Amino acid sequence: LLGTAAATVLLLAASSAARADDAAKVLKSMTDYLGSQKTLSASFDSDIEIITPELQKIQFASSGQMKLSRPDKLRVRRTGGYADVELVYDGKTISIYGNNAKSYVQADAPGTVDQMIDAVQAKVGVGMPGTDLLLSNAYDELTAYAIDGRHIGQGVIDGVECEHLAFRTSDTDWQIWIETGAKPVPRKYVITSKTLAGAPQYTLRIKDWKTDAFADADTFVFKPPAGATKADLDSGAIAEFDELPPGTPSGAAK
């Protein structure tokens, strides 16, 4: 009996290790595939949760589109109840336009999309959840602080069969659903903050993936709409570009 129990424990341990290795392998196939594409475009729906001081959970929803041309061009449009924002990067200048505010900010940012994303999040303070999936070193970034990874099984997102992976870090849990087959693109991405009361989540659903070249030469050219005003990057106007409404409690969001 003891021998059987020991064998069972060893089998479970081996199975757990195999599942962890499998999770890393599936994730790597996704990041390698995305990273190898010269151009990418997709549509997305996102939900971000906040926890109020009264411990009520509120969710804000938005939708958008993304177009990427490696290594140095990106265009993202996101529309929600409190923000209608467009980010355009041409390899030299980053432009962020807020349609509700009818104003835009610009900054010199020569380099790659990877460098631009780092600069925006670090210097401007505009959150860009999900952009880590687009980085050229996405696998390293996603797994940098992971303490556990598991291949949970299969799932279906928007009618598409996916592999379901779950990873943990010290302060967040995150899950990703990756399409099976020859094009392993991410279909759903969920980040759960464990250090905040109520464990708020950020959820991203991605669809309409395309890898076609963009025929329009103006895709990554920012043209301020008539009547738009230019705001200073360091001014309070940048708050107009947030995904959350004014007055959201500090620290309440994921």
What are these regions (language model features)?
Residues 21-26, 42-47, 95-96, 105, ...:
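Gly/Pro-enriched, hydrophobic low-complexity segments
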Residues 22-103:
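N-terminal mature ectodomain segment of secretory-pathway/periplasmic proteins
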Residues 96-132:
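Acidic/charged, solvent-exposed loop-and-adjacent secondary-structure segments enriched in E/D, K/R, S/T
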Residues 226-254:
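Gram-negative outer-membrane assembly/targeting C-terminal domains
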